[in-house]
Amino acid sequence: MPEQDLSKVRNIGFIAHIDAGKTTVTERVLYFTGETYKIGDIDDGTTVMDFMSLERERGITIGSAATNASWRNHQVNIIDTPGHVDFTAEVQRSLRVLDGGVVVLESVSGVQPQSETVWRQANEYKVPRMIFVNKMDRLGADFYNAVQTVHDRLGANAVPLQIPMGAESSFLGMIDLLERKAFIYESEDAVQHKETDIPDEYKEDVEKYRNELIEKIAETDEALMDKFFDDQELTVEELKKGLRKAVLNLEIFPVLCGSALRHRGVHPLLDAVIDYLPSPIDVPSIKGTNVSDESIEIERKPDASDPFSALVFKVVTDQHVGRLVYLRIYSGVLESGSNVYNSSTRSRERAGRLMKMHADSREEIKEARAGEIVAAIGLKDAITGHTLCDQSNPLLLESINFPDPVLSCLLYTSPSPRDIRRSRMPSSA
């Protein structure tokens, strides 16, 4: 298996308050990238990512689901997370292993209570992210108010990368401020959008918000700032490079807009994911500690030549294959059927089979390399937060710590008639 260019990998998650349209965005991404040929619909219970019967029945995401797609010759590994406050742990475990995030906001309300929670969690793990203001076709949609709520409630430097053309039923598309081009959608089919010159009625707004964007980017880079104050024109490439650097440093959070339900704004969002969110080599190398002495720090680079290290971030039971252990591989190579060292339990385990997950479907692979997110079958003792590594080069990664529960209870199952009959039978001598 040829080694993958890690600069062309994106490990991202979609995070949001409930009903912001996060899963709908993910479904449109899968359709637009050609991973699915039929658009999943929450109301019809046909989504790819919400595959559990209870999720489809209630129309909400309960568990995080992993998938992958390809865009502009880049591999995009995606985790779709729940928006409901009761499933916050699913968001936390996902953010722990992701390199970047897309925060989906609803165009009417902007930042909502759970938006604040997931934003704090992303801050905790220093996850670079961008913002997608969804449902621009909804009654009461207000892009600029949504951006303002990010400033007011999150204290984040949110800067529009696009501005919408219209809102509510008159939402036609969006304008790319850096490129100075408009995307107009004339039908419900996302493929049918067209790039045009900026309509006259938006030219003044474009120059206003473009200048604000340029100034924000220049503030984060001394070389760009010098050119800006010398009244030298900054090229689009210079601005994109500066914006990417600012996003990676958590200095700017670019804002895009669209309507996922009507397929509008998906392809510019994907382009922005590739252009501005980090690859595994753009984020700091993972650091752990010596298994015997926690005061000794060990670093692993995202390279296949480094010793193997991975973190377990989720364990589920599949009705067809049994126990599935989800891993983020930080360094080295994991081969199917190989033995690994669980440094959390000080024991050896065997990764029998490796799977690349697409929601509830699986694609068996022979090996997985640094930067990938996969599932393993055969790991019997590994649980969430455990470190798997090369036994000859062990280390212990920081575990995943969940908030303490506010409620505890015991569940008792009703005994079956067979159990009752057994309890009444006299015991043998």
Task: Identify the role of each PLM range.
Residues M1-S414, R418:
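Structural and coupling elements of P-loop NTPases
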Residues S416-D419, S423-A429:
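Positively charged, low-complexity/disordered segments
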